[in-house]
Regions:
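Catalytic core of bacterial c-di-GMP phosphodiesterases, primarily the EAL and HD-GYP domains
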Residues: 1-69, 79, 142
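Surface-exposed amphipathic alpha-helices with a cationic face
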Residues: 15-16, 46, 68-78, 125-132, ...
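EAL-family c-di-GMP phosphodiesterase catalytic domain
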Residues: 29-32, 55-63, 79-178
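Active-site acidic short loop of glycosyltransferases
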Residues: 49, 76, 101
Length: 178
């Protein structure tokens, strides 16, 4: 819990320096859903909740921590929800039905070589279609080549993340140079 609180406090310190129309994505471990601080006005991110997307990876059974009810409470606080790493070993389609995320981030294992593998293309296309029907936007993680970019665009993915766009940067370096 302390690590999560520390991360949230660090993010909150830099939010005022980020343009108002930029969403801030913050990873939240499933166990953090048991931390009442996350749901309170005392949470460092509370003043910025409307700009924050909490990325949840289903690495533990969310039902064991009251996940769906807790996620509903986060929405009441103003946060948006993303299912992170969909397609990785633990992030299952059940998370889409249970959490009803505003955003779905496709794991890079589905994106790497997407342009070369017909089965991956069918899977990503089907997920993108399903997400659109459910009202979720889709982000492709790990886009590293122009060919992968062309493939995800063709398949209806909304946004990309990966080395093709930018390398990981410290705090605001990327945001402030775009």
């Amino acid at each position: 819990m302390n690590l999560g609180r520390t991360v949230r406090a660090a993010v909150a310190r830099v939010v005022p320096d980020i343009p108002d129309d930029v969403l801030i994505f913050v990873n939240v471990h499933g166990l953090e859903l048991t931390d009442d601080d996350l749901f309170s006005d005392r949470c460092a991110l509370a003043p910025f909740a409307s700009r924050v997307v909490l990325e949840i990876t289903e690495r533990i059974g969310l039902d064991t921590v009251g996940g769906p009810a807790r996620v509903a409470m986060l929405r009441q606080c103003g946060y948006r929800i993303a299912v992170d790493d969909l397609g990785a070993g633990y992030a299952a389609l059940g998370a889409l039905a249970t959490l009803e995320p505003e955003i779905v981030k496709l794991d890079m294992s589905l994106i790497r070589g997407l342009d070369l593998h017909a089965t991956k293309r069918r899977v990503v296309g089907a997920i993108a279609t399903l997400c659109r029907e459910l009202g979720s936007r889709v982000i492709a993680e790990g886009v590293e080549t122009q060919a992968e970019l062309a493939a995800v665009r063709e398949l209806g993915v909304d946004l990309i993340q990966g080395y093709l766009l930018a390398r990981p940067a410290r705090e605001l370096a990327f945001v402030l140079t775009c």
